[in-house]
Amino acid sequence: YAESWINVYSDWLKTFPYEEGTTFPEEGGKENDVDYQWKGLQVAERVISQIDIMTYFIQSKNFTPEWLSVFLTAFAKEVECIRLNYYKEGNILVTQAQAVAMAGILMPEFKNANEWLSEGSQKLGEQIDKQFLADGVHYEFDISYHVGAISDFYETYRVAQLNNKAGGFPAGYLEKLKLPAHFVMDITYPNYSVENFNDTRSSRLGKSVLIKNFKKYAEMFPDDQEIQWMASERQSGSTPTYLQKAYTNGGYYILRNKWDDQSMMMILKNNNNPNNKYHCQPDNGTFSLYK
């Protein structure tokens, strides 16, 4: 496997060379499809995955010192390419910042590692404030993107914590994810499923996935007994007592008659999205009834 990966990646590097310092047109520009492999998610996902790939293959006899040099040189180019070509906004920018921060945390041998961590963590802190509205709803109004955004923001912070580098993140970083976590709790049906509001892909958010995320939220906020209750499938923690919740910034209004597996729920969607952006659909007034 290691030899095959080295052969494939070596060929890829020769086929798609990157000249250091190259910048590309802004996202959505008319030349955006040129050099696509060096833009946006493509580079960020390579950086994140290559950290895992290196640790997986480095014990192989085929992972020679010569190849290590090639790999690390290419890795540094990838990170610096991201830094020169950040998106202005959106989930792709979050992944770019995540990749740069992860590189700084997990590849401390690089001379720019501290810069990578500082820059990446700062951008993640800025994006938490921009991507979650005042009531905690993600600005794309898509439940699956909402859950994914919490995960992206937290995973990078968690890796920093495990490596004693969380101090590089802005003050109050983790606490800003508490309202978003509670929104997931409030909009989840009694059978641990969610509705297909906007572009939500509810089939990807089944019971096991939601419980896994609630356990992650319980790890983030160990003193929050309501989240613990959701994470434990109602076996421990404290049952919420409120029966209605209005997310007035995000435009989700939730009613229920109780908090057990026999509960009835109604959710009304009335998102404030005047520019028809991203993953929100123009169907305000849609409601769902769970019984």
What are the language-model segments listed below?
Residues 133, 137-291:
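Carbohydrate-active enzyme catalytic cores, enriched for enzymes
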Residues 1-178:
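Aromatic-lined, polymer-binding surfaces characteristic
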